[in-house]
Amino acid sequence: MKQFAASAAPKSLSREDIQSYGINGYLVLPNLINEDKLIPILNECMAAWHREKDEYNPKATWLKNSLLPDIHHRSSLVRCYYFDGPLVDVAQQLIGPNIKGATSQLTFKMRGNIKPFGWHQDNGYGQLEPTNAISTLTALDNADEENGCLWLIPGSHKGGQVDVSDRLSAQAKLAEKDLSIEIDNDKSAIPIPLNAGDAVVLHCHLLHRSEGNMSTTRDRRILFLRYADADAVEVYNGNQPRLGPLLRGVSRFGEVTEYERELFDG
């Protein structure tokens, strides 16, 4: 697999960056991808999106309107970025030497999609142990309050996992049960505006949400990539190993070591 060349590689975090992440539960990485690399990625993402998605339908579900999973199966440039880009360097510094990919998807709020997405933790959608997985959101557009940028509560990861297990049954998933969390006081919440090419890294327990896209002229397109310890297991699945491509280091699970190995030559 060809290496991904970003604006700076490998991506090294400062001591202050790591301390800030520990305190606040998030880290903004400005200009992680320069424009020359970003535009081809966006083009491949949009080609994949238009192959599988219709125009925004206000009567459709969030999954149908806003999410395209396994984008690394549909875009070779995303695959290179996911498997060998600067976010893997970041994951090693925040998680440890042994890293696997846990999720790749497009999370889009196209113009006209004014539906908000409530407070939640990403570990609530797929609880992993150890609880040091990170979610990364790379902005494919400029994102601000008008077009639905992320909001988060700094330091909220320290509260640990909020139990939403009653909404994780097979029946609940089929019904697309809401996993949002009621927050008594969100006055400490802050918006996280991003420029295209920036990324934000979130601890798996950090509370975050987004408002609808109120812009009539701009989309808010995000490349969402999740990384975990190579030995992370799915708590909701009898502590079976989370399957994902082994990107750095080693795993004690053979099925992780072999997972999607055929993609590394493509």
Short names for language-model regions:
Residues 1-24, 29-128, 165, 247-256:
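Non-heme Fe(II)-dependent double-stranded beta-helix
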Residues 62, 127-132, 215-219:
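A generic structural micro-feature
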Residues 117-123, 138, 175, 185:
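Active-site glycine-rich loop that binds ribose-phosphate moieties when present
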Residues 120, 127-145, 193-196, 201, ...:
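Short, conserved beta-strand element in jelly-roll/cupin
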Residues 145-209:
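Double-stranded beta-helix
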